[in-house]
């Protein structure tokens, strides 16, 4: 019979997702039902994304929040506007604090983004439109762009 040394497993650096949740969700469908009949062409979609990171009271626990806003328009109507704040609570275990910024800005958002994307797709479909499928986001590129802007 062999024994497993759990001490080495506990010392392994890893990210634990303790919770995921919708903090705020709003969908406006201001021109319905007229806008639903006028969907011959693809609407123009304006999309914005922001990431907020909050250090929670417990050591190495952080809330990472994705703020996603999308507005769809055609030449006649504002079709819909959706705003979602989706967050996760992450515990960075046995990870050097110098690595926290990149993990919290890149890896943690990438872990929760698919869930936020699904919520937006479902809500827009439930509003009578084609589901808004947001393209995958390169959080690493966003992080490096933000870092280079801060250096300039």
Swiss-Prot record:
It comes from the Bacteria. GO terms for molecular function: unfolded protein binding. Its main location: cytoplasm. One of its GO terms (biological process) is protein transport. Keywords: Chaperone, Cytoplasm, Protein transport, Translocation, Transport. Signal peptide: none annotated. It is found in: Cytoplasm. GO terms for cellular component: cytoplasm. One of the proteins required for the normal export of preproteins out of the cell cytoplasm. It is a molecular chaperone that binds to a subset of precursor proteins, maintaining them in a translocation-competent state. It also specifically binds to its receptor SecA. Belongs to the SecB family. Homotetramer, a dimer of dimers. One homotetramer interacts with 1 SecA dimer. This is Protein-export protein SecB.
